Amino acid sequence: MINKTAKNTKRLRRAERVRYKLRQTSERPRLVFNKTNRYLTAQIIDDAKGVTLVYATTLEKDFPKHENSKKSKSAATELGKVVADKAKKAGVSQVVLDRSGMVYHGRIAAFADSAREGGLEF
């Protein structure tokens, strides 16, 4: 059985390694996806200026209600659509996905696919 501490340490090391490489490409902002025990968040960050351009979360009042929860795969799909819409309004079309060291599977894949369908390129 895998120790949770070791699993989390490996994820954090992957996240730092990936973020270092992503910060080297300053021509595109980072699309950061994060999941907590209750909610999902996403933000687009311009590392050159150190500014958050777009922020969206399942905690917002205008976020569509889901029968399962605010951290489900369907909520991740809706969050991808919301982020893509806000990015269009902010004038952002190309981003780099920062998955915070997590495996590209499940909620992250659903979020990324719906953001691509919404018009973001990465």
From Swiss-Prot:
Instruction: Tell me which Gene3D superfamilies the record gives.
Output: 3.30.420.100
- What HAMAP family does the record point to? Ribosomal_uL18_B
Q: Which domain of life is it from?
A: Bacteria
The signal peptide, as residue positions, is none
Which Pfam families has this protein been placed in? Ribosomal_L18p (PF00861)
The family note in this entry says: Belongs to the universal ribosomal protein uL18 family.
What function is annotated for this protein? This is one of the proteins that bind and probably mediate the attachment of the 5S RNA into the large ribosomal subunit, where it forms part of the central protuberance.
Query: What are the UniProt keywords, alphabetically?
Result: Ribonucleoprotein, Ribosomal protein, RNA-binding, rRNA-binding
One GO cellular component term of this record is: cytosolic large ribosomal subunit
The species this protein was found in: Leptospira biflexa serovar Patoc (strain Patoc 1 / ATCC 23582 / Paris)
GO BP terms, alphabetized:
translation
Supply the InterPro entries for this chain: Ribosomal_uL18_bac-type (IPR004389), Ribosomal_uL18_bac/euk (IPR005484)
A Gene Ontology MF term for this entry? 5S rRNA binding
Task: Provide the assembly information.
Answer: Part of the 50S ribosomal subunit; part of the 5S rRNA/L5/L18/L25 subcomplex. Contacts the 5S and 23S rRNAs.
| Protein name per Swiss-Prot or TrEMBL | Large ribosomal subunit protein uL18
